[in-house]
Regions:
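Conserved ABC ATPase signature
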Residues: 116-120, 124
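Hydrophobic anchor residue at the start of the ABC signature
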Residues: 130
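Helix-to-loop junction immediately C-terminal to a conserved catalytic motif
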Residues: 47
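Helix N-cap at the start of a conserved alpha-helix in ABC-type nucleotide-binding domains
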Residues: 152-154
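Conserved ABC ATPase "signature" region
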Residues: 97-112
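Catalytic Walker B motif of ABC-type/P-loop ATPase nucleotide-binding domains
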Residues: 141-145
Length: 194
């Protein structure tokens, strides 16, 4: 994926100005900067949720994007772990149960089968969210503040999964203000300047 001179505005306010990035297949990148400076907007622009004022985002053929957002709405909604992971499957097929199981194994989350998603800890939810991404067979992962709201134990669990991504044949952009991610991951770091 290539981003060329991306500019994004909300009304007349410039949120992103002349941002460029050339992401190669398999490359892992952390975009580091304070909250409220447009990092999430960048991900939403890549996804096409937010329209760019100018600039280009160029994707490789057959780019499949998986997005892990930082918030979990409707905490009382009774959705199971398997149902969350199944959201990554575009079409129900005869192998969908096997695909879900394989994705949970890949995310080291098979022990969470059968549980309600909102009964899980923050770190466990992030593992399940990664399993959903794996189920999409995505080659580009967008992670929005993936370690936010995690206690120390949950963060350590999730860091293991982030390290596992290093061995996957996918590209990753993680946006964060968490210095611990930078210290614990040997990824390219881009300092976000608004």
């Amino acid at each position: 994926m290539k981003i060329e001179n991306l500019c994004v505005k909300y009304d007349k306010n410039i949120v992103i100005e002349n941002f460029s990035l050339n992401l190669t297949l398999g490359e892992k990148v952390i975009i580091y900067g304070p909250n409220g400076t447009g990092k999430t907007t960048l991900l939403k622009t890549i996804l096409g949720i937010v329209k760019a004022a100018s600039g280009k985002i160029i994707f490789e053929d057959n780019e499949i994007i998986a997005y892990c957002k930082q918030d979990y709405p409707n905490p009382e909604f009774p959705i199971t772990v398997e149902e969350v992971v199944a959201m990554g499957i575009k079409k129900q097929n005869k192998n969908s149960k096997e695909d879900i199981k394989n994705a949970l194994i890949k995310a080291n989350a098979l022990n969470l089968q059968g549980r309600l998603f909102y009964s899980l800890s923050g770190g466990e939810r992030q593992k399940v969210s990664l399993a959903r991404c794996y189920c999409q067979n995505a080659n580009l992962f967008l992670l929005d503040e993936p370690s936010s709201f995690l206690d120390t134990k949950s963060k350590n669990i999730f860091l293991e999964q982030m390290k596992n991504l290093e061995n996957q044949n996918c590209s990753v952009i993680a946006v964060t203000h968490d210095e611990e991610l930078i210290k614990n991951l040997n990824w390219k770091v881009i300092k976000w300047n608004k």
